[in-house]
A protein has these predicted regions:
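Short, basic/aromatic beta-hairpin or loop at an interaction surface
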Residues: 1-3, 142-152
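Gly/Pro-biased beta-strand-loop elements
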Residues: 30-142, 166, 194, 200-282
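N-terminal targeting pre-sequences for secretion and organelle import
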Residues: 162-205
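Extracellular LysM carbohydrate-binding repeats and other cell-envelope/extracellular binding modules
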Residues: 2-39, 180
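Short beta-strand-centered segments at strand-helix junctions
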Residues: 151-165
Length: 283
C-alpha cells in the first residue's frame, strides 16, 4: 500500500507512529478502473498500477496490483495509451536538462548522469514508455511511493518493480487513466470508492453518477431492482478515503462494513523512513 492510500483510509491515525494497539484499516479491496484489461493499467487518481498477465494454457488471466508514486503538481504524469519500449536493469539516470535547470536554480546542482547505485533515483529497474522521457521504475526513496513527488515518471517499491520487471515484456500496452470514482459489483453488492481527485482536474462528479448508473444497468443476473443510497454515495465521494463500500439502499453502512472486517495483529516494523523533502526527484 502507498502513503496516501493509508493516510486517507486512516485520517485519525499517525501512519508512521500509530501507537501500540492502534487499529489501522488496510484498504486492500480494489475496484478496477474502466480501461482495456490487457497489459498495464495505471490509475493516477488512485495511485495504483494493475498488470493483466497474458492468459495461461487454461485461458485464465492473473491480475497483479501495486501502489505507485506519480508526477507532482506542475509535472503531472501524462494520460493516454502507450507501450513498453525498453527494459533496463541497474539503469543510469540521464538527467533531463529541465530538471537540472530546476535544481541549479534551487542551489542543488545535479550531474548530467547519475550512475547505477544506491544514490540513483531510478532504483534497480526501469521500464521505458513510448512517451518520450517517461519511465516506470523503482526508487532509492521508497517512502515516496503513494505520493506526488516525481517529475512525471511512475515509481514503485523496489520489490514490486523487481517482480514486475521479470513479468512484463517489451511491447506490453500501458493505459494511464485518471479515475477518482470507481464502482463495480462484488457478488450481489454494488461497491463504490472515491479517491481525492488530482488538484489540476478536480474530478468529474457527473461522470461518477453516470458510472454508477451504468453499473446498475449491468447488475448480475438474479439481482433484483437496485436502489442507490445517493446520500451515502455523496458522503463517500466527499471523504475521498479510497475505501470500497456498498451503496445500495439497505446495505451495511460504512461503519458497519468496517467493523465486519477481519482483525489481524502484527508486530512488524516498517522498513521505510517517513517521507522527507525529495531533494533528488526523478524524471
Amino acid at each position: 500500500l502507498g502513503y496516501e492510500e493509508m493516510t486517507r483510509a486512516n485520517p485519525d491515525v499517525d501512519i508512521w507512529l500509530p501507537g501500540a494497539g492502534a487499529v489501522v484499516l488496510l484498504p486492500t479491496q480494489f475496484i478496477l478502473p474502466e480501461a482495456p484489461r490487457d497489459g498495464l493499467v495505471l490509475n493516477v487518481a488512485a495511485m495504483r498500477l494493475y498488470y493483466y498477465a497474458p492468459e495461461d494454457q487454461d485461458g485464465q488471466t492473473t491480475l497483479y496490483t501495486h501502489p505507485i508514486g506519480i508526477g507532482r503538481v506542475g509535472w503531472a504524469t501524462p494520460l493516454g495509451t502507450t507501450r513498453i519500449t525498453a527494459k533496463a536493469a541497474n539503469p543510469a539516470w540521464y538527467v533531463p536538462e529541465s530538471i537540472r535547470k530546476e535544481h541549479a536554480e534551487a542551489g542543488d546542482p545535479l550531474p548530467a548522469v547519475v550512475p547505477p547505485g544506491p544514490d540513483n533515483p531510478l532504483g534497480a529497474h526501469a521500464l521505458r514508455l513510448a512517451m518520450p522521457g517517461y519511465l516506470i521504475h523503482g526508487t532509492n526513496k521508497p517512502a515516496g511511493v503513494g505520493l506526488r513527488v516525481s517529475h512525471g515518471c511512475i515509481r514503485l517499491y523496489p520489490e514490486d518493480i523487481a517482480s514486475l520487471y521479470e513479468m512484463v515484456p517489451k511491447g506490453t500496452p500501458v493505459h494511464i487513466v485518471e479515475q477518482p470514482y470507481l464502482a463495480g459489483w462484488h457478488g450481489d453488492r454494488l461497491m463504490f470508492s472515491a479517491h481525492v481527485p488530482l488538484e489540476e482536474t478536480g474530478g468529474d462528479w457527473l461522470a461518477a453518477l453516470e458510472l454508477i448508473d451504468r453499473r446498475v444497468q449491468d447488475a448480475p443476473e438474479g439481482v433484483g431492482p437496485v436502489e442507490i443510497d445517493w446520500r451515502r454515495v455523496a458522503r463517500i465521494a466527499r471523504e475521498g478515503k479510497g475505501v470500497a463500500y456498498p451503496i445500495e439502499a439497505g446495505s451495511p453502512v460504512p461503519a458497519a462494513w468496517r467493523a465486519a472486517s477481519p482483525l489481524v495483529r502484527t508486530e512488524a516494523v516498517a522498513n521505510y523512513r517517513p517521507p522527507e523533502d525529495e531533494d533528488v526527484p526523478e524524471g
